[in-house]
């Protein structure tokens, strides 16, 4: 009814411009949502990769880079695994440290990981080399960022000295081999984090007790001298020997004519897990009763109680949007002496910045909808003005205003729908191509990512489409009401 030769000459270009305007606006909205959501997911994924969604730590542990020791509990470990939405649980320990090279020093956070560590994130950002094997006997290996390597002029397979800083007066040194270089683009993290086996953090932090047995290789006056020493803990050691009469660290005097085994259990006043050192004296000649005849000494330890301590548990969940719910569930499952740190608690400035990006998207959406409304209002008014004679004729024949208004609203809906359809084809099409082929590059030094990130948010796309249609049609009610002001007599007479 609204199509005629007149429309082809006058209205058609206006309608086409309105359709193109709506299509461009919708395409920009789709791209804005896809890019911002993609960027947020990329950055969130990298931050989570450095420290998981949650860290379960001691109540004495503030949000920082220096873990407070925590006695590992298999029960807590298994309970965390059973919680809904939890996909992975791993232990960790971190400590401030210093990497030294010939070119200078670099302060770092040394993160120790165990065999249960989820390597997916770190493997995805390793640019040179490869991680160490979990079953490798040699663990003196370290992964650093390319940023740190460039600053200190280090390269793959170089040996570096790392100092573990326990307090102002205690820095313990250990040499490592660089086995991999990673790069994320997040300078605050790349300039800090290095990764190694958790055993080094446990040992050099002095979290547990390491007991050693000392046995004299020379027999004097028919007796063999033995003693014990220990490291770690609080330094105030107490010794419990296999022989009740032996006290302290020694020396203990052993008179024996046959093979003998003995041990010492070492504890401290702070209640640190004890460690035990063992020794065995084996005589070569069993036929003799001379206590000073040739013998062999074998000593061993239980490995040190530091292996029983961790910095905490890291918990990964299947959906970042469930962070609050999962936090409540995790906290309720923990004993009184543990607490949780969400990833948003550990890096609030990054997540505040990411949240502000949503404001940019809202501004773009509002502007595009306003432009669409202006385009449609102009187009609808021109169509109505062109159709004054038709409107007057319909009114003269007895038609009321409502059916005529509906006709123009239906026509508006058709134009808006066509614009939204083309906007979806263009916007989602470009987003899908970028998601698949990554053909638009970025400078990672400025944007943290090497290509424009895309997240295809189908639910948001549908909401945007419905919202745009609803707002535009609602806005068309005002210009469509102009129909009610058209007089049948004047419009017919005018034409």
Regions found by a protein language model. Name each.
Residues 381-383, 390-435:
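Transmembrane alpha-helical interface segments in multi-pass membrane proteins
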Residues 70, 74-220, 236, 247-249, ...:
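A structural signal for hydrophobic secondary-structure junctions
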């Amino acid at each position: 009814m609204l199509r005629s030769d007149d429309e082809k000459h006058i209205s058609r270009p206006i309608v086409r411009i309105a359709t193109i305007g709506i299509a461009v606006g919708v395409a920009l909205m789709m791209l804005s949502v896809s890019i911002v959501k993609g960027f947020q997911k990329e950055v969130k994924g990298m931050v989570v990769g450095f420290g998981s969604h949650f860290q379960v730590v001691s109540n004495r542990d503030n949000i920082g880079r220096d873990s407070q020791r925590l006695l590992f509990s298999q029960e807590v470990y298994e309970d965390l695994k059973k919680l809904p939405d939890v996909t992975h649980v791993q232990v960790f320990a971190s400590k401030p440290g210093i990497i030294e090279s010939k070119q200078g020093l670099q302060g770092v956070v040394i993160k120790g990981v165990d065999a249960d560590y989820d390597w997916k994130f770190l493997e995805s950002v390793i640019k040179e080399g490869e991680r160490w094997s979990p079953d490798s006997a040699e663990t003196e290996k370290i992964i650093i960022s390319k940023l740190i390597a460039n600053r200190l002029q280090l390269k793959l397979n170089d040996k570096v000295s790392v100092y573990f800083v326990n307090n102002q007066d205690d820095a313990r040194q250990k040499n490592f081999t660089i086995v991999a270089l990673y790069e994320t683009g997040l300078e605050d993290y790349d300039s800090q984090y290095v990764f190694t086996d958790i055993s080094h953090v446990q040992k050099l932090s002095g979290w547990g007790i390491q007991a050693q047995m000392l046995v004299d290789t020379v027999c004097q006056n028919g007796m063999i001298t033995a003693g014990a020493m220990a490291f770690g803990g609080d330094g105030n050691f107490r010794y419990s020997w296999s022989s009740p009469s032996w006290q302290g660290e020694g020396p203990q005097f052993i008179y024996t004519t046959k093979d003998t085994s003995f041990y010492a259990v070492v504890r401290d006043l702070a209640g640190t897990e004890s460690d035990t050192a063992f020794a065995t004296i084996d005589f070569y000649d069993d036929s003799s009763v001379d206590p000073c005849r040739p013998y062999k000494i074998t000593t061993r330890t239980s490995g040190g109680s530091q292996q029983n301590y961790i910095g905490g548990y890291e918990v990964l969940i299947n959906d970042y949007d469930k962070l609050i719910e999962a936090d409540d569930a995790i906290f309720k499952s923990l004993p009184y002496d543990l607490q949780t740190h969400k990833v948003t608690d550990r890096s609030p400035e990054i997540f505040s910045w990411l949240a502000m990006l949503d404001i940019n998207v809202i501004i773009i959406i509002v502007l595009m909808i306003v432009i669409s409304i202006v385009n449609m209002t102009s187009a609808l008014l021109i169509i109505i003005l062109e159709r004054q004679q038709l409107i007057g004729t319909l009114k003269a024949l007895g038609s009321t205003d409502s059916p005529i208004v509906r006709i123009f609203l239906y026509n508006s809906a058709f134009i808006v729908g066509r614009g939204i359809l083309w906007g979806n084809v263009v916007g989602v099409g470009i987003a899908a191509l970028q998601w698949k082929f990554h053909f638009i590059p970025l400078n990672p030094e400025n944007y943290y990512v090497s290509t424009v990130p895309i997240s295809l948010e189908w639910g948001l796309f549908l909401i945007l489409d419905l919202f745009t249609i609803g707002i535009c049609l609602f806005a068309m009610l005002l210009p469509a009401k102009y129909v009610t002001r058209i007089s049948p007599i004047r419009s017919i007479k005018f034409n």
